[in-house]
């Protein structure tokens, strides 16, 4: 009973400190005209409690801060962040420590080939999201589709590029996006998103994610994890509509 009482007291003291600290931020933002409130909770696993609270609150967007390791400038997602990517049904904004430029540049990553049983409507949701965000921020956006021709060495030369070009063009024909903002890249998704994001000097990547079986996660989940870990910009993760 003593241990239980001590634990409860320590937990309350810790939560009280967090509440006081957060209230300072709330007061400052409220003074700037924002309608904002704060809440501190104690739960395990934390990501489940976060998702539950966001759904009960009726949130349109969940924001998670991702810290970099100072010495190597590497953004490694915490367990909670990665679980949110996999399980949060809401749009999830992973915020890094890079500052946005004066003119915001966004990059949407799509897969019109619908690989790995990706829902057909997800790419449309990604374009809708990047269009909405860029409009609200007064920025511009580019659309990227990556494929790796070398991944299928026994396919006739040019066949893979032809398939992906047709799928990409057919999909984008339904949207009013200038050709100079459309990029078809012969590279694996990991390196394409990382390198082209740096080339465009983008401030945010908008990409999709789907919940997979444990077997599928073991086989292809590492690709998504590498993208999320190594890309330095903010990432907006979109989930398929129910």
Model-derived features with residue positions:
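Small/aliphatic-rich secondary-structure junction motif
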Residues: 1-12, 105-155, 161, 170-177, ...
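Structural beta-alpha unit
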Residues: 10, 27-62, 69, 173-215, ...
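A structural signal for isolated positions on well-ordered beta-strands in alpha/beta enzyme cores
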Residues: 37-39, 107, 140-142, 181-183, ...
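Glycine-rich, Arg-bearing micro-motifs that act as flexible, cationic patches
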Residues: 64-83, 207-230
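Short, flexible loop segments at boundaries between secondary-structure elements
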Residues: 92, 233-242
């Amino acid at each position: 009973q003593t241990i239980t009482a001590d634990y409860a007291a320590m937990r309350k003291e810790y939560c009280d400190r967090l509440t006081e600290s957060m209230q300072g931020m709330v007061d400052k933002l409220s003074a700037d005209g924002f309608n904002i409130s704060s809440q501190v909770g104690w739960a395990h696993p934390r990501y489940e409690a976060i998702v539950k609270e966001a759904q009960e609150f009726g949130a349109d967007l969940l924001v998670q801060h991702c810290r970099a390791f100072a010495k190597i400038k590497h953004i490694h997602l915490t367990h909670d962040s990665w679980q949110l990517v996999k399980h949060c049904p809401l749009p999830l904004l992973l915020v890094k420590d890079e500052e946005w430029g004066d003119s915001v540049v966004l990059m949407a990553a799509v897969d019109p080939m619908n690989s790995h049983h990706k829902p057909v409507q997800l790419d449309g949701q990604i374009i809708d999201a990047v269009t909405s965000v860029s409009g609200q921020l007064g920025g511009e956006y580019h659309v990227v589709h990556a494929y790796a021709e070398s991944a299928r060495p026994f396919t006739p030369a040019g066949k893979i590029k032809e398939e992906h070009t047709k799928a990409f063009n057919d999909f984008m024909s339904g949207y009013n996006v200038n050709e100079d903002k459309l990029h078809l890249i012969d590279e694996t998704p990991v390196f394409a998103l990382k390198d082209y994001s740096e080339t465009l000097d983008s401030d945010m990547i908008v990409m999709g994610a789907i919940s997979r079986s444990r077997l599928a996660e073991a086989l292809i989940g590492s690709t998504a994890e590498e993208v999320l870990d190594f890309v330095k910009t903010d990432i907006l993760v979109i989930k398929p509509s129910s």
